Swiss-Prot record:
Main location: plastid
One Gene Ontology molecular-function label: electron transfer activity
Record's subunit section: The PsaA/B heterodimer binds the P700 chlorophyll special pair and subsequent electron acceptors. PSI consists of a core antenna complex that captures photons, and an electron transfer chain that converts photonic excitation into a charge separation. The eukaryotic PSI reaction center is composed of at least 11 subunits.
Protein's recorded name: Photosystem I P700 chlorophyll a apoprotein A2
InterPro entries, alphabetized: PSI_PsaA/B, PSI_PsaA/B_CS, PSI_PsaA/B_sf, PSI_PsaB
Length: 734
């Protein structure tokens, strides 16, 4: 009996129904709830699993490098990055038949291949890789690192190498290691790579292990560093006529503040990027040494937090008690980490297209669209996760006595005001935005487009003007040619910035109008509503007006009838579940907006977006329907083409998405009856009744069925949009 799944819970292992399997899967990673768990084992298991996670990441990236080196066309792409389509890997068995083989043979390949829309070619090219041998070397190196991490993970589970709980709770040493050791040193190392390998590579100089000690990255070597003449490293930058990867028009500078973009590659100057990483390294190396570790100097985190009490006395006890609360709660720490990582991931999406760092990636439109959408979806899932673990913190780890009148307690005291304000903002945004869209829609339908309500986003335009955009005629700050800031910007700092802002060949400070104003507020509605649901879920996790006693019911209690006033949809889990739908909805609006605006920019018909985005039918007809034409083609006399796989995925994504509703809109009793009927029929059917099972089949619980429904909804939604995005963009631009 002891060997039945799940081994971590004897109670579940003895459950006679299929609930054993589902609950086992659901709680496999909830280490806190496992039998015989101690705080020490909990921390050690999580620590060891981090090494496994890193090993998988390095193995995966190694696989990317290996497959491109083996089956890709990196070397021919390097010769002509704008016209050769980068190959991700070969397709072993293209479906169906000879037409498929022909459709997928592209990018100069001899057989069927997949095109890469991940941007790895541009990244590898920018950082100095040039040959397949370079890629193989990188793949082997990462494979080696992966093995090291696997060994390290195993090692830290051995009795002699297991760290103690006190080691895990030593916050200052961890800050020292993470800030200085990981962020600081890795940023410094990356600066070194850019200066010693990537920048010479961009100037046609091939630096590798055999010659990197002989090639001076800068003609004056380390002289300017030791004599304090650091400005010499910025002199003689690459010229505007520089051809990337060659010495033609190249300079000698290694650390610059040029601003703007390299005219040929449309990406940030590599010397600016190196300078940025050096600054980051300096900041983090200093930051990591501000806290008191073994030497008795520096700040104590506990003292810092306890001293953070707002003067005047009307705002409570500030951060008092937070140190122990955070340091003893893994859920709080995970919540903070996820919130930070989620914001950073969304910022990556925003900056990868507006300030592209990799050579020629800005001209690879499908890759730009794929990377933006990918990072926004990832950010959404990570950010909702932050609130989920925040709610679990309140249920499992929050101690009211320890946090009396501090910022956490005051958040709970004021939760009604917080929730009602968020609710008001969401209602205001929703009704006004929808009202404008619907009004405009009706005006178009009745043939009186001039009666639309069109609002110019003057505040946003003013902000863009303040940063140097001249087309609105605001004549303020950096867009005012007579101002001191403008004149300083021509010479002292970032001289390329103003050119970049006012050029139409990039996505920096796009011109905005009434369509942008409306969709901006639609997105604001989505963000505020998602936040409302998540914040309410976390703040009401321990107890709410309807049910003040939630603590002992945990995170995901199900509907429990009318007792205690009814518990349907009031667990923290239910709030998270509802918020994910709103998150997906919001990111849908964000990506629709980004994609449609960029498609019209890239095609040179931006007036289509401007005119059609102010009413609902415009979005449905001129964005969704018009761009899905290649995906809803069905069978035609011309046979298949290279977009057929996306057409199939578009259909399949809709199917998966629709299956979600089968779990979301049905009652548990219906499933239980269906299961009983099927089991009864099975047991009375010859041959079939030879197969028996030990577990009595029972329907999923309400919470489980919602999870299965949500998973299908999310996966189907993303599959559908991914197929639409890649097919509609690559169909137009290759």
């Amino acid at each position: 009996m002891a060997l039945r799944f799940p081994r971590f819970s004897q109670g579940l292992a003895q459950d006679p129904t299929t609930r054993r399997i589902w609950f086992g899967i659901a709680t496999a990673h909830d280490f806190e709830s496992h039998d015989d768990i101690t705080e020490e084992r909990l921390y050690q298991n999580i620590f060891a699993s981090h090494f496994g996670q890193l090993a998988i990441i390095f193995l995966w990236t190694s696989g990317n490098l290996f497959h491109v080196a083996w089956q890709g066309n990196f070397e021919s792409w390097v010769q002509d990055p704008l016209h050769v389509r980068p190959i991700a890997h070969a397709i072993w068995d293209p479906h169906f038949g000879q037409p498929a083989v022909e459709a997928f043979t592209r990018g100069g390949a001899l057989g069927p291949v997949n095109i890469a829309y991940s941007g790895v070619y541009q990244w590898w090219y920018t950082i100095g890789l040039r040959t397949n041998e370079d890629l193989y070397t990188g793949a082997l190196f990462l494979l080696f690192i992966s093995a090291i991490f696997l060994i390290a993970g195993w090692l830290h589970l051995q009795p002699k190498w297991k760290p103690s709980v006190s080691w895990f709770k030593n916050a200052e040493s961890r800050l020292n290691h993470h800030l200085s050791g990981l962020f600081g040193v890795s940023s410094l190392a990356w600066t070194g790579h850019l200066v010693h390998v990537a920048i010479p590579g961009s100037r046609g100089e091939y630096v590798r292990w055999n010659n990197f000690l002989d090639v001076l990255p800068h003609p004056q070597g380390l002289g300017p560093l030791f004599t304090g003449q650091w400005n010499l490293y910025a002199q003689n930058p690459d010229s505007g006529s520089h051809l990337f990867g060659t010495s033609q028009g190249a300079g000698t500078a290694i650390l610059t503040l040029l601003g703007g973009f390299h005219p040929q590659t449309q990406s940030l100057w590599l010397t600016d990027i190196a300078h940025h990483h050096l600054a980051i390294a300096f900041i983090f190396l200093v930051a990591g040494h501000m806290y008191r570790t073994n030497f008795g100097i520096g700040h104590s985190m506990k003292d810092l937090l306890d001293a953070h009490i707002p003067p005047g006395g009307r705002l409570g006890r500030g951060h008092k008690g937070l140190y122990d609360t955070i340091n003893n709660s893994l859920h709080f720490q995970l919540g903070l980490a996820l919130a930070s990582l989620g914001v950073i991931t969304s910022l990556v999406a925003q900056h990868m297209y507006s300030l592209p760092a990799y050579a020629f990636i800005a001209q690879d439109f499908t890759t730009q669209a794929a990377l933006y959408t990918h990072h926004q979806y990832i950010a959404g899932f990570i950010m909702t996760g932050a609130f989920a673990h925040g709610a679990i913190f309140f249920i499992r780890d929050y101690n009211p006595e320890q946090n009396e009148d501090n910022v956490l307690a005051r958040m709970l005291d004021h939760k009604e005001a917080i929730i009602s304000h968020l609710s008001w903002a969401s209602l205001f945004l929703g009704f006004h935005t929808l009202g404008l869209y619907v009004h405009n829609d009706v005006m178009l339908a009745f043939g009186t487009p001039e009666k639309q309500i069109l609002i110019e986003p003057i505040f946003a335009q003013w902000i863009q003007s303040a940063h140097g955009k001249t087309s609105y005629g605001f004549d303020v700050l950096l867009s005012s040619t007579s101002g001191p800031a403008f004149n300083a910007g021509r010479s002292i700092w970032l001289p390329g910035w103003l050119n970049a802002v006012n050029e139409n060949s990039n996505s920096l400070f796009l011109t905005i109008g009434p369509g942008d104003f409306l969709v901006h507020h639609a997105i604001a509605l989505g963000l505020h509503t998602t936040t409302l649901i998540l914040v309410k879920g976390a703040l009401d996790a321990r107890g709410s007006k309807l049910m003040p006693d939630k603590k002992d019911f945990g995170y995901s209690f199900p509907c429990d009838g009318p007792g205690r006033g009814g518990t349907c949809d009031i667990s923290a889990w239910d709030a998270f579940y509802l918020a994910v739908f709103w998150m997906l909805n919001t990111i849908g609006w964000v990506t629709f907006y980004w994609h449609w605006k960029h498609i019209t920019l890239w095609q040179g018909n931006v007036s289509q977006f401007n005119e059609s985005s102010t009413y609902l039918m415009g979005w449905l007809r001129d964005y969704l329907w018009l761009n899905s034409s290649q995906l809803i083609n069905g069978y035609n006399p011309f046979g298949m083409n290279s977009l057929s796989v996306w057409a199939w995925m578009f259909l399949f994504g809709h199917l998966v998405w629709a299956i979600g509703f089968m779990f979301l809109i049905s009652w548990r009793g219906y499933w239980q009856e269906l299961i009983e009927t099927l089991a009864w029929a099975h047991e009375r059917t010859p041959l079939a009744n030879l197969i028996r099972w030990r577990d009595k089949p029972v329907a999923l619980s309400i919470v489980q069925a919602r999870l299965v429904g949500l998973a299908h909804f999310s996966v189907g939604y993303i599959f559908t949009y991914a197929a639409f995005l890649i097919a509609s963009t690559s169909g137009k631009f290759g």
